[in-house]
From Swiss-Prot:
This protein's name: Adenosine kinase
Chief localisation class: nucleus
Cross-referenced CDD domains: adenosine_kinase
Function recorded in the entry: Catalyzes the phosphorylation of the purine nucleoside adenosine at the 5' position in an ATP-dependent manner. Serves as a potential regulator of concentrations of extracellular adenosine and intracellular adenine nucleotides.
Coiled-coil regions, chain positions: none
Binding-site residues for Mg(2+) 1, renumbered to this chain: 48
GO molecular function: adenosine kinase activity; ATP binding; deoxyadenosine kinase activity; metal ion binding
The protein's assembly and partners: Monomer.
Residues where adenosine binds: 34, 305
Keyword set, alphabetical order: ATP-binding, Kinase, Magnesium, Metal-binding, Nucleotide-binding, Nucleus, Phosphoprotein, Purine salvage, Transferase
Entry-linked InterPro entries: Adenokinase, Carboh/pur_kinase_PfkB_CS, PfkB_dom, Ribokinase-like
Cellular component, GO annotation: cytosol; nucleus
Amino acid sequence: MAAADEPKPKKLKVEAPEALSENVLFGMGNPLLDISAVVDKDFLDKYSLKPNDQILAEDKHKELFDELVKKFKVEYHAGGSTQNSMKVAQWMIQEPHRAATFFGCIGIDKFGEILKSKAADAHVDAHYYEQNEQPTGTCAACITGGNRSLVANLAAANCYKKEKHLDLENNWMLVEKARVYYIAGFFLTVSPESVLKVARYAAENNRTFTLNLSAPFISQFFKEALMEVMPYVDILFGNETEAATFAREQGFETKDIKEIARKTQALPKVNSKRQRTVIFTQGRDDTIVATGNDVTAFPVLDQNQEEIVDTNGAGDAFVGGFLSQLVSNKPLTECIRAGHYAASVIIRRTGCTFPEKPDFH
């Protein structure tokens, strides 16, 4: 064939060997509009909120959202844990656009339109399942000092349906294009069957499946769903509070975070070609990383405490930074360095927002 004589292959060699394709990173979760405000202790007490927690809204929180908007100076940001991480990863990757894919459910309303436009602005390839039974989900971020208490009203986010969205050929094709998958544990409360379908696909095709413990209540009240997916998890993320709750629920009988990481790393695993890695962040304290060989502590970047504006999204940003390097098969130390960098940028700004370009080398 004449085509074989054309000097096309040569041109390819000049390009970076790790050139990324669109949709290389896949995320699925709860798309929420964050409504954040600096509040006082009285407000937290009134709604019996802990200063640093993530919970799902109950009946007693019905008035919270209205009161937050009326009483305090609020800011609206496109949020939702996994969606935040996809945006940060895409920001760190820069080119190509749409390297990160995101699936989730929204309502057909103003907030839904905001989420769509914000995802497009961030160059994330978002494919929402849109339905009109529930409005787009919101998350109240109640900030006091360096703490944030999150109250999520999932609404539409809770309506994601595997058979109505994930299973559709055009959507599943995007799953097949990815090399790395990330789902926040929060999504186990919505569609565990969707999480399992993606996790199994990753294991069968020797691709990297990553999950976040997300919040203490996931390990407590969604233990069965969490442990059903755990054998498929190649990289597990979490913070120190989530790690402690997970250890207690699993009967690890230790409060030492390194030991918790080691025991979690050793839990049963389906794809034996990949050793599990467990990564626990601890705010300003060292990030703990357990691999098959050892447990290591990585110090975070020195941060002037006065510069910290809003720690909401720091964990999501860490994951986003980490994944941005993982898709290019960078070593673990580089992935962690990128995670620490991204988190350090995000905590100096309100919401999970970032400047135009990263300064990471």
